């Protein structure tokens, strides 16, 4: 395991242990709904289903077709806020 992987695992573990991961997930969920991202993603899913036909689409197809666009649609402000929260948490709980 690379040093970066070990660090990511340690950070993730600390976020989970302190309950911060769940709080961050809830914040992210709320922000994505607030900015309309969720509605945009629903529309993308409907588009993929319409193009391929409901009988010809698997969940895997949907995920593969929507994930890159979905990630690109997340507003920078939401990404920045989440990153700031993570940094603040780590600064407060660094060992």
Curated annotation (Swiss-Prot):
One of its GO terms (biological process) is transcription elongation by RNA polymerase II. It is found in: Nucleus, Nucleoplasm. The lineage of its organism: Eukaryota, Metazoa, Chordata, Craniata, Vertebrata. Its main location: nucleus. GO terms for cellular component: DUBm complex; nuclear pore; nucleoplasm; SAGA complex; transcription export complex 2. Gene3D superfamilies: 1.10.246.140. Keywords: Activator, Chromatin regulator, mRNA transport, Nucleus, Protein transport, Transcription, Transcription regulation, Translocation, Transport. InterPro entries: TF_ENY2, TF_EnY2_sf. GO terms for molecular function: chromatin binding; transcription coactivator activity. This is Transcription and mRNA export factor ENY2. Pfam families: EnY2. The keyword Nucleus applies. Belongs to the ENY2 family. Involved in mRNA export coupled transcription activation by association with both the TREX-2 and the SAGA complexes. The transcription regulatory histone acetylation (HAT) complex SAGA is a multiprotein complex that activates transcription by remodeling chromatin and mediating histone acetylation and deubiquitination. Within the SAGA complex, participates in a subcomplex that specifically deubiquitinates histones. The SAGA complex is recruited to specific gene promoters by activators, where it is required for transcription. It comes from Danio rerio (Zebrafish). Component of the nuclear pore complex (NPC)-associated TREX-2 complex (transcription and export complex 2). Component of the SAGA transcription coactivator-HAT complex. Within the SAGA complex, participates in a subcomplex of SAGA called the DUB module (deubiquitination module).
